[in-house]
Every structure is written in C-alpha cells, then in structure tokens.
Amino acid sequence: MEKFGMNFGGGPSKKDLLETIETQKKQLLQYQARLKDVVRAYKSLLKEKEALEASIKVLSVSHEADVGLAGVQLPGLTFPDSVDDRCSTHSEDSTGTATSLDTAASLTSTKGEFGVEDDRPARGPPPPKSEEASWSESGVSSSSGDGPFAGGEVDKRLHQLKTQLATLTSSLATVTQEKSRMEASYLADKKKMKQDLEDASNKAEEERARLEGELKGLQEQIAETKARLITQQHDRAQEQSDHALMLRELQKLLQEERTQRQDLELRLEETREALAGRAYAAEQMEGFELQTKQLTREVEELKSELQAIRDEKNQPDPRLQELQEEAARLKSHFQAQLQQEMRKTALAEDQLRQQSQVEEQRVAALENQISEVSELLGTYEKAKQKDQLAIQKLKERILQLDLENKTLALAASSRSPLDSHGEESSLDVNVLKDKMEKLKRLLQVAARKSQVTLDVEKLCDLEIMPSSEAADGEKATALYYQQELKQLKEEFERYKMRAQVVLKSKNTKDGNLGKELEAAQEQLAELKEKYISLRLSCEELEHQHQQEADDWKQELARLQQLHRQELERCQLDFRDRTLKLEEELHKQRDRALAVLTEKDLELEQLRSVALASGLPGRRSPVGGGGPGDPADTSSSDSLTQALQLAAANEPTFFLYAEQLARKEVEITSLRKQKHRLEVEVHQLQDRLLEEGERHREEVAALQSHIEKNIRDQSREGANLEYLKNIIYRFLTLPDSLGRQQTLTAILTILHFSPEEKQVIMRLPTSASWWPSGKR
C-alpha cells in the first residue's frame, strides 16, 4: 500500500513503533529517577516540616503558658518587686528563646556553609545548655523573689520549658541533619557530575586523537594514491610516447623495405632484359632457319590466342559478374533486413496502439466505476439527509409530545380527587370559574399543539348560566371536569402509544440506515480492493511493456552491430578483390608487353633478312638470267615468303594497338564500375545511417509514447486529469453541502498538489468539510 502512496490503515510502521517504545522506555527511566529524587526530597522536607511545626507548636504553647501564668499570679501579688521579677523572668525566658532561635539559625547557616568539613549532627545541643542555665538562673531568682507561694508553678514551668527546649533541640537537630544530608548529597552529586564530565572530556579527547590519527592515515593514503596515480600516468604517457616512436620507426623501416624491394625488382627486370638480349644475340645467327619456322608457328598460335583473347574480351568477365551478383545479393539482403525491421517496428507500434486502447478502455471503466461510486455516494448522502430531516422532525414531534404530556400531567396532578373534595368544600363559584378559565386556556394550547379538536365551547355555555341554577351548574362542572379528566387520560395514553410507535419506527429506521451504511462501506472496500488490483495489474503491464521495450532496444542494437560488421566485411572483400584484379591486370599487361617486344624484334630481324636477300634478286636480271633459272626462283620464293611474313606480321601492330586500346577501355570501365560500386556502398552506408537514425527516432518516439502511457497510468489518464480539474472547480464553490463523502471517496484515487490544497484551505467554507487526516 505504501508503494501506491496510500495507507488505508492510517497507523505507523513497526520501526516507528519500536522507536517510540525505546524513547518511552528512556523517558520512563528518567521519570523514575526524577521521581525517586522528588520522593527523597519530599521525605526530607516532611521531616523538616514536622520539626518546624513542633518548634512552632512549642513556641506557641510556651507563649500561651506565659500569658496564663501571668494572669494567675497577678491577683495574688502585693509587691511591685515580684511583678518586676516575673517580668524580668518572662523577659529572660523570651530572650532565652530568642537566643536559642538565633543560635539555631546560626548553626543551620554554618552547617549549610561548612557541611563538608563538619558532618557531626550532635554539634547543635550546646546552645540549649546555656539556655537551660539561664532558665535555671531565672527560675532561682524568681523563686527567691516570689517565695513558697509560686514554687510549684515555677517548677512546672521549668519542667515545661525543659521539655519545650528538648523538642526544639531535637527539631533543630533534625533540620540540621537534613540540611547536612542534602548538602552531602549535593556535593556527592556535584563530585559525580565533575567525574562524569572529566570522563566524558577524556573520552572526547581520546576519540578526537583517534579520529585525528585516522584522518592523518587517510590523508597519507590519499597522498600515496595520488603519487601512485601520478607515477602511473607518467608511465602510461612514457609508454605511449615510446609506442609512438616505435610505430614511426617501424613505418620508416617498412617504407625503406618497400623502396629497396622496388629497386631490386627494377634491377631484376633490367638484368633479365640484358640477359635476354645477350642470349638472343648469341643464338641469332645459329638458329635463324629454325626460328623462322618457329616464328611462323608462333605467329599462327599468337593469332589464335589473340582471337581467343578477343573472344574472351567480348565475353563478360565472370569475376565482375560475381561482384555484381554479390552487390545485388547484399542489396537484397539489406533491403530484406530493413523490411523485417520495419515490420517489427510496425508490429511494435500495433502492440503499443492496442495496449494504449486497452489502457484507455481500462481508464474509461475506472471512470465509470468512479462515477457510479460518486452517484451511489450522492444517493446515500441524499437518503442520509432525508433521514436526518425525518429524524429532526420526529425529535421535534417527540419534544412537542413531551411538552404536551408535561402540561397534561401538571393539569392532572393539579386536579386530584382528594383536592377536588377539599376544593368543593372550601372554594366558591368564582374561584372555580377562574380555574376553569385556566384549564380552558391549557386545553386550547394542548389542542393547538396536538391538532385535536376538543369541544371547548361547553365551558362558555357554563359561564352564561343564570345565578339561580348555580348548584346545578357546579354539579355539571364537576361532571364535566371528571369527563374531561378521563378524556385527558385517554389522550395521554394515546400520545404515549404514539410516542412509543414513533420511537420504534425511529429505531428501525436507524437500524436500516446503519445496515445501508455498512453495505456502502463494504461496497467501498470492495471498490478499493478492485482499484488496488487494477493498479497492480497496470503496474505489471507497465513492467512487461518496459521489458519488451528494453528487449526491442537490445535487438535493434544487436542488428545495428551485425549490419556494421557485415558492411565492414563486405568492404574488406571488395577491396581484396579489386586489389587482386589490379594485380592480375598488371601481370597480364606485363606478359602482353613482353610478347609484343619479342615479336617486334623478330619482325625487325625478318625485315633485315628480307632486305638482304632481296638485293641479289634484283641483280640477277642484269646478269641475263632467264625466268626458268632455279636461283631466280629460289630468291623469288624467299622474297615472297619474306613479304608474306612481313604482310602477315604488319597487322600485329594494329592488333596490339587495338588490344591496348581495348584494355584501356576495359580498365576505365572497370574503374568506373569500381567507382560506381564504391558510390553504391557509400549510398548503402548512408541509407543504413538514415535507417539507423530513423530507427533511433522511432525508438525515441516509442519511448516517449511508453513514458506517456506510464504518466497516464500514474494519474489514470488525461480523462482523470480532466475529472480532477472539474472536482477542483467543484471544491472551490461556496456550497459545502454533501461534499464530505464524495471527497473521501475521490481522495483515495486523486492526489492534490500542495498549492491546490492551500488554495482550497484559504476558502472560509472548506474547514468544515475538509478531512483532518488529509490536510
């Protein structure tokens, strides 16, 4: 219940109860100690009071005795000397008592000042000895002055004074003893408090020293950790700088190795070319004929190879097709994944929409239940008000009937049968008429209150009777009064029965109202339980939706990570393939260039041979040889063969140039295709980034929607917010009739802010119906 911000029980928790029990135990112990101190002080004060009362009693008795003794001795004395002696004796007694009191006060003061140095309680009695001596001296002087006539009285007086002195000394001793005991207890408490203060100060000093030591240790540890962190930071910085230097050196070494490798490759190519030239020059003259035949065969083979190369070049490259297929497959894969993600987001949106609809339906159901509860409470309040009005009317009716019963009882008691006989014998007609007038007025008042028509006009007829028929009138009035008394008794019985019926109906109505109130309370408790169960189910659904949203977030992050990894892998594959294709193109170019250089050299050699063989053929016609000469035929055959070779080898340059141009075109097309693929990869990356951004926006929108649902569930939706505003306007109205039950029912669901409560509490009519427990 505490999780929902509600406490239907209204009681504190177990921890608070235990804390209150502990504090009350401590307070009880303190109160017990204080009570013991108070009892001890009260006992000492009682002892002092008893001692002081005894001393006061003794002093008062001594004074009365002195006065009585003086009154007894004055008639029997004839000499003024004896009067003077007695006066001196009395003055000596009074001075003795005064000195004794002064000595007692001085003793108490000295005891209060030096109670620690002198604790003996028996130090007070010495002053009474001197006083007793003075009393004895005064007694001797009085006895010597008075003679045997006052000897017995003086002895009695001396004995009485001694007893008074003993009581005074004992009371003084008790007072001084109590004072000394109080002083000793005070000093002991003071010493104990000083000792406690010293112990507390020592403990505080020890605790302060310990805390200072711990603080110093912690400061040293902090300094050590700071120094260690600084050294570690310096070490890390040094390691980073060393690693950077090592990387630079390794990069330099790698660059040097690359340059050396390139130089070695160039040298190797040069040496190869030199060796090929030397071997070709050495073997040129030896295998000319064999080379011509081989060259012809090689030319044919080269023609066939060139034709095959042309056919292959005309056909599309399978690697390029594989790359295009791979790119298309990746595109389709990414599009399928994007569509799948879009479907998932659409499903999530549908689920959230359905959930929001379900929540709205629940909120509407809760609003309907709240409206039903408010209507039910309104009907109960109206019925209660009607019942209260009926009860008030019945109470007024009962009070009216009580008043009527009282008046009738007074009237009946005023007319008893014994009194009627006495009045008939003692009263006359005028007195009876006056009483009849009074009874008539009482009957009229009772008739007006009870709404019962009584025949009061007969009394008026009695007044108009003649004086000659007075006796008959008196008899008629007596009979009429008896009948009226019977009617009044019957009316009183009817009123009593009616009052009993009214009380029974009131009790039954109160019972029915109590049952209806209990039923309403049970229904309210059931509604509270339903509200709590609905709140719990809403929280469970909220937790489930939050968990589903977290799962969707994790799935989205995982898919994004997979897409990034797959994109990086595809980029690496494309780079590797492009590098391999470039290497193969370079190798093929090198091979084609080497073959073309060899063929150029062979063609140059053939041309030189053809030119050398063509010179003697031109000279033979000058020598007069016929056409049938075999030398001429051989030379012409060789020339035609050379020309045929030259004619056959001349298109190779054009083929080479065409092949180079075709290769350049293919290279440019491959570069364009590579550039296009890179552009497509960049577009895919941009699209993935856009999709990721869109997914993030959708996730943010879904999160905001979930938070909105959570806020709506926490306040039971915007409709309940609207309901709260309406109730707030209703509460600010000046009319306060029937708001208590509705407010207690709604405050279990809605929570007002402190500002709203202050605004409501500022109103003058809100203090009567605002509940004290909800302020």
Curated annotation (Swiss-Prot):
Species in which this protein is naturally found: Homo sapiens (Human)
UniProt biased composition (Low complexity): 94-110, 133-147, 629-638
Keyword Coiled coil: yes
Entry protein name: GRIP and coiled-coil domain-containing protein 1
Gene Ontology CC annotations of this record: cytosol; Golgi apparatus; Golgi membrane; Golgi trans cisterna
Coiled-coil intervals, chain numbering: 13-61, 153-763
GO MF terms, alphabetically ordered: small GTPase binding
Limits of the GRIP domain: 713-763
Chain intervals with Basic and acidic residues compositional bias: 84-93
UniProt keyword Membrane present: yes
